[in-house]
Swiss-Prot record:
Its main location: secreted. It comes from Arthroderma gypseum (strain ATCC MYA-4604 / CBS 118893) (Microsporum gypseum). Zn(2+) binds at H309, H313, D324. This is Neutral protease 2 homolog MGYG_02351. Residues 1-17 form the signal peptide. InterPro entries: Fungal_M35_metalloproteases, MetalloPept_cat_dom_sf, Peptidase_M35. It is an enzyme of class 3 (hydrolase). GO terms for cellular component: extracellular region. Keywords: Cleavage on pair of basic residues, Disulfide bond, Hydrolase, Metal-binding, Metalloprotease, Protease, Secreted, Signal, Virulence, Zinc, Zymogen. Disulfide bonds join C191-C260, C267-C285.
């Protein structure tokens, strides 16, 4: 597992990168081992192999406490359907409870049930593995100064399908249908106060930014290379098609259903909005409405790009749907082309950069 040193904190504008000290080089610092502890139960053991204490941000990692995509599960060479949530987290004003403080050579365990976020009712042999990136801060600090990669062992399990099917799905059941705006597919009965108008504005801005980003992807190869790490024509066309799909979904009735508020208890602290890709549903959280409609800061979060980000998580809009492989400009700018094109934040940051001329 290799560590990638960063020059700036998550979300910081490119112009500031040169003024921020480089992060520590923590080569091979985090080790992750997976072990089966039950029919579909997994225990992840995360070890700090370094010689100094690290603060590890839990968001979208193996340590995430929410029903997120912590591992990849395969059966007979095909990926098992993920039924959990893909959240967008607020990356500013991070608090200590979002981190795991891990001393030198120390370990922490995190257990979760695969059957709560995957359809394992078929039963049989599956293979499970995890890989990703953990944003890191210094001991007792919450400012992101680096990232460390991790890649686990590959675990083989023989699952009892009936026992797995009896496990309650974390995000299972049907969301209340409510009253739906036929033009936007917003569940208007889920909206309070001026939330409906704020969401409609965000969708309109998402469409505008997506169309501009699609145009820039074809006309500005230098900017495209900066974010997507290639100017290959097939990748350009894929990105253009995806931006235009987001634009269409933002302006007319599509296959996603958008809720102004949470109906599934997914809006935990730090979550701006989240998507259930297995259902093509998007839910806003209270913190979403505290964001600006459009941010005037390069790579800053706002309602428009959060909506754009979440729409790329929906397979009805983007196939295969985008994941959360890296957050913020500094991490996004270091993703290889194969991952950049599948990373939701790459699309939202590129759209923001085109809009502001970053």
């Amino acid at each position: 597992m290799q560590f990638v040193a960063l020059l700036a904190a998550l979300g910081a504008p490119l112009a500031l990168a040169a003024s921020i000290p480089a992060a520590h080089n923590n080569s091979s610092i985090i080790d992750v081992k997976l072990a089966a502890t039950g029919n579909s139960m997994i225990k992840a053991i995360i070890t700090n192999n370094g010689d100094r204490t690290l603060n590890l941000l839990k968001f979208n990692t193996i340590m995430d406490e929410h029903p997120t995509r912590k591992v990849k599960v395969y059966q007979d060479g095909a990926e098992v359907q993920f039924t959990g949530m893909l959240p967008r987290y607020k990356m500013s004003d991070l608090t200590p409870d979002f981190f795991v403080n891990l001393g030198p050579k120390a370990s922490v365990e995190h257990s979760f049930d695969l059957a709560a976020t995957h359809d394992l009712s078929r039963g049989g042999k599956i293979t499970v593995s995890a890989n990703g990136v953990v944003p890191t801060a210094e001991e007792n600090e919450t400012t992101i100064t680096g990232h460390t990669h991790y890649e686990s062992n590959e675990l083989t399990m023989d699952v009892d399908g009936k026992e797995a099917a009896a496990v309650e799905q974390s995000m299972g059941g049907d969301s209340p249908a409510g009253v739906i705006d036929k033009r936007s597919n917003i569940v208007t009965s889920s909206c309070r106060g001026n939330q409906l108008q704020m969401l409609k504005t965000a969708l309109a801005n998402s469409a505008r930014l997506s169309k501009a980003a699609a145009s820039a992807a074809q006309r500005n190869p230098r900017k495209f290379q900066e974010y997507f790490k290639t100017t290959d024509s097939s990748t350009v066309q894929k990105v253009v098609s995806r931006f235009m799909s987001v634009a269409r979904e933002s302006t007319s009735t599509g296959k996603t259903t958008y809720y102004c508020n949470d109906t599934r208890d997914g809006c935990k602290p730090g979550v701006l909005a989240y998507t259930l890709p297995s259902k093509n549903q998007v839910f806003n959280c209270p913190s979403y409405y505290k964001l600006p409609a459009l941010n005037n800061r390069c790579h800053g979060q706002d309602m428009a790009t959060t909506t754009l980000h979440e729409l790329t998580h929906n397979p009805a809009v983007v196939t295969p749907f985008c994941e959360d492989l890296g957050y913020g400009y500094d991490r996004v700018s270091r993703l290889p082309a194969s991952k950049a094109v599948q990373n939701a934040d790459t699309y939202s940051l590129f759209a923001n950069a085109v809009y502001l001329g970053c």
